[in-house]
Design a protein with these regions (language model features):
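Structural signature of hydrophobic alpha-helical transmembrane segments
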Residues: 1-2, 43-61, 105-118, 169-179
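Hydrophobic transmembrane alpha-helices of multi-pass small-molecule transport proteins
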Residues: 6, 28, 60, 68, ...
Length: 252
């Protein structure tokens, strides 16, 4: 709710965009997929499977994006694109710590895979609306509508929450989450899709394990294995390949 309020406030600074009644069904679908279902499947998924499985399955997002782009006719990807996307998944597998593979469950794995599929549909399905509404308004509208689906689940939990016992660090984390992880994150994602296209944007999401690896090494002094360095190199090269590959976008 805080994130959607923040983004809606920023839309007042944006130039006016026309929103027709015919846009509402698609906005509702995008809100349900990209905000409600994605968050539910991702959060409950990582709670029920290993970090290793989560990283690998969520890295399937670019693969699903390429498939959806091809099926809908929005993007025609070259062979180099397919090579880069596939290699990126391999890179994520190499970066993962094999010791964290224990503790996974089929339910958790399916939930994470569902999250990847929801995010892919959210990315590819935004194309026609992005051109007219722009990334800021589309992010704000879908986030606001997505928040409505949380109400039946969120209000009972809030009523039971002992606010006086919540530490200030938790409040700080909440503010950071809705300002940066949600508001800024969703906006920049759609901004990138509007500039780069769905596939080229999606491939950058697989840089997350590389970033996490680098931060853990720099700030926590964690050891980085040869396997992980090789995986990071594969991800970087595959991202470059997709960035340089020929992807033909069509108006849908």
């Amino acid at each position: 709710v805080g994130s959607s309020t923040l983004l809606l406030a920023f839309t007042l600074l944006d130039k006016p965009r026309m929103l027709s009644r015919a846009d509402l069904p698609r906005l509702l679908v995008l809100a349900l997929l990209g905000h409600t279902l994605y968050q539910f499947t991702f959060i409950f998924g990582i709670d029920r499977t290993s970090a290793s499985n989560s990283a690998l399955l969520i890295s399937m997002t670019p693969v699903v994006v390429v498939l959806l782009g091809h099926m809908t006719g929005q993007e025609r990807s070259s062979s180099l694109t397919w090579v880069g996307v596939t290699a990126s998944v391999l890179g994520v597998y190499l970066v993962m710590d094999p010791s964290s593979a224990n503790g996974g469950s089929i339910v958790g794995d399916l939930l994470i895979l569902g999250a990847a599929i929801c995010w892919a549909f959210y990315t590819v399905g935004s194309k026609s609306l992005l051109g007219r509404l722009g990334p800021l308004r589309l992010s704000a509208y879908t986030m606001a509508l997505g928040s409505l689906f949380y109400i039946p689940f969120g209000i009972p939990s809030l009523l039971r929450l002992p606010f006086e016992q919540v530490p200030w660090t938790a409040w700080l984390g909440t503010v950071y989450s809705f300002v940066f992880a949600l508001s800024a994150g969703y906006f920049f994602w759609y901004y990138a899709v509007s500039r780069l296209g769905a596939t080229r944007t999606a491939i950058y999401s697989n840089l997350t394990p590389v970033t996490g690896l680098a931060i853990a090494w720099l700030t926590l002094g964690e050891n980085v294995s040869v396997r992980q360095m090789l995986g990071a190199a594969v991800i970087l090269v595959s991202t470059y390949l997709v960035r340089q590959s020929r992807i033909t976008e069509t108006e849908v």
